[in-house]
Amino acid sequence: MSNEPPPPYPGGPTAPLLEEKSGAPLTPGRTSPAVMQPPPGMPLPSADIAPPPYEPPGQPVPQPGFVPPHMNADGTYMPAGFYPPPGPHPPMGYYPPGPYPPGPYPGPGGHTATVLVPSGAATTVTVLQGEIFEGAPVQTVCPHCQQAITTKISYEIGLMNFVLGFFCCFMGCDLGCCLIPCLINDFKDVTHTCPSCKAYICTYKRLC
């Protein structure tokens, strides 16, 4: 065996440094930064194209003319739990005073009616409602002459007189006693007529 030293190691300190693809040699302790290269056939992005601005989630896009419930009309925010005070309202049953147009307002128990007279002029006549024609004169308006009158009454023999006469005969009251009910006005029917034009108005029957 010879005593010559072994040849130098290929990766020893005397080996030449490796070069990057760009041609710059790598220094000891420094690594090449990773560069993202687009795949073949895809163009590089332009520097003028910027990503869209970031919008935080949960913010709805306001509609034109819409005012959120927590925002006033002038754009200011109201604190949570705050509600504007209600406007003034009149109490129930209150009617504000004011001028009312004049008109023919009927009184209690009556209504107004317009009657055309032969001359062609319109005349307003008040007809009383709810009048009860009984055994006494009644104040009303004559439907014929349109005058406010008090009716004239007259008595006529009616059904109640005949019923009482037959009852007297059944009880044995004969010899003309059965005719006594026909002489009593409280048992007769009452006819109401107009004292002005003598027209018939109504008949009150004691017994229908």
Curated annotation (Swiss-Prot):
InterPro entries: LITAF, LITAF_fam. It comes from the Eukaryota. GO terms for biological process: apoptotic process; intrinsic apoptotic signaling pathway in response to DNA damage by p53 class mediator; tumor necrosis factor-mediated signaling pathway. Zn(2+) binds at residues 142, 145, 194, 197. SMART domains: LITAF. Residues 1-70 are annotated as: Disordered. Residues 164-184 are annotated as: Membrane-binding amphipathic helix. Residues 122-206 form the LITAF domain. One of its GO terms (cellular component) is cytoplasmic side of lysosomal membrane. Residues 1-13, 50-67 have a biased composition (Pro residues). It is found in: Late endosome membrane; Lysosome membrane. Keywords: Apoptosis, Endosome, Lysosome, Membrane, Metal-binding, Zinc. One of its GO terms (molecular function) is metal ion binding. It is a peripheral membrane protein. The keyword Isomerase does not apply. Transmembrane segments: none annotated. Belongs to the CDIP1/LITAF family. PANTHER family: CELL DEATH-INDUCING P53-TARGET PROTEIN 1, LIPOPOLYSACCHARIDE-INDUCED TUMOR NECROSIS FACTOR-ALPHA FACTOR. Acts as an important p53/TP53-apoptotic effector. Regulates TNF-alpha-mediated apoptosis in a p53/TP53-dependent manner. The LITAF domain is stabilized by a bound zinc ion. The LITAF domain contains an amphipathic helix that mediates interaction with lipid membranes. This is Cell death-inducing p53-target protein 1. It comes from Mus musculus (Mouse).
